[in-house]
């Protein structure tokens, strides 16, 4: 049995704020602003490097954070994490979830996010108790925290390698719901720690009240928000309203003693599927863009700051414990995926075995796990060790599992492109390469490095390739109904082209408005049409 080393003397716990006297109170406001500016610039640079290296953005943030001097830290306040960051992450996932897509996958999602989380957490807790010698209540808390899946990393892998839409929906839906389930279980474990235990009946009652009460609070506030949406009909006011609802729902849930996470999830689903459908297309685009940015910003700060807060030497010393934790929660995941989905196949459409492999390989940990670790009560035995263990486990998971996930998904060949998709891709490749070659020919001609007769001959050859490719693509476009019936890959190709064109049109209109070239009334009408077309592409 490997004992988790006592890190209290090694890691500067002041860097993981556990007292009211936080780093934020010790830094001058000007220094804090300067640090934030530097961190934002670092995050921007990381995004560019991650795109160039073709690695997930969040992994780049963590690695960059490890290299950043600790003097740039702005502190990680547990109260800020719990009451501000968590509601934003949960609400952003919920407001972007289409209930109509969830209906067809509700059974596997419910099984995985309900009994699946309980089984996985129980097995993980036993293995952590045996492998790391943690106290039972501590092992239970860590196991629940590590049942949460990082949707950001998984969806990033799905974008690089196309997967069936139903699988993506299951992953997103399970991740959204198991956040709430994990927080309820963590609340029960915390209560057991504080009270010294209670009966099984009392535990079931608490869980029931947390789920049902949270759902009712979310429904009530969500429907109230729907009514206010009808009255406001203004994008900026609607943004303020949704921010108030997301943060306020979380606080009300805590005050009433119900699941704040479930309340925020339900409120987000109601607003995203009822309120937004009653607003104009431009308001909907603005709102969804705002929440996409909010979620992106929170994830950026959490991953970057966590990388700063953990000493590389401490991370290296806790890698053995982190590897044990990863093995433990992966074993728990195996026993919650294969048996449950096998039993479910008798009552619902079976999930292919390759999909189940992805659900296990995609069991990557992320920002929510770290946020919950920071929000643990200060009196929990070994809390400082737990925080360090969770941080190290998340980092190893992101780097190891996060980098390997796209390769695993590609090897499983979940969505083979049809011959038609391959043909379209080849024609597009011909267009790109031929036009690039023509551009180089023009440059050589103007520089005097190429005779004109040779330029004309070579240019004509490439022009013939372009003409042939464009003719074949035009024929595919004229048969677009056939293309759509071939599968989602081809439709995504056409939709992607339209989306880029519509965005280019919007950009041109906004530039013209800024220069006073176009009238506001006519431009607003056309922008509304473009927004509706963009939303139609998203809804397909």
UniProtKB/Swiss-Prot annotation:
It is a multi-pass membrane protein. The keyword Lipid biosynthesis does not apply. One of its GO terms (molecular function) is potassium:proton antiporter activity. InterPro entries: Cation/H_exchanger_CPA1, Cation/H_exchanger_TM, Na+/solute_symporter_sf. It holds the Pfam family Na_H_Exchanger. Disruption phenotype: Mutant cannot grow at low sodium concentrations and exhibits an increased sensitivity towards potassium. Its main location: membrane. Belongs to the monovalent cation:proton antiporter 1 (CPA1) transporter (TC 2.A.36) family. PANTHER family: NA(+)_H(+) ANTIPORTER NHAS2 (PTHR10110:SF195), SODIUM/HYDROGEN EXCHANGER (PTHR10110). Required for Na(+) uptake into the cell, especially at low external Na(+) concentrations or low Na(+)/K(+) ratios. May be part of a sodium cycle that permits re-entry of sodium into the cell. This is Na(+)/H(+) antiporter NhaS2. It comes from Synechocystis sp. (strain ATCC 27184 / PCC 6803 / Kazusa).
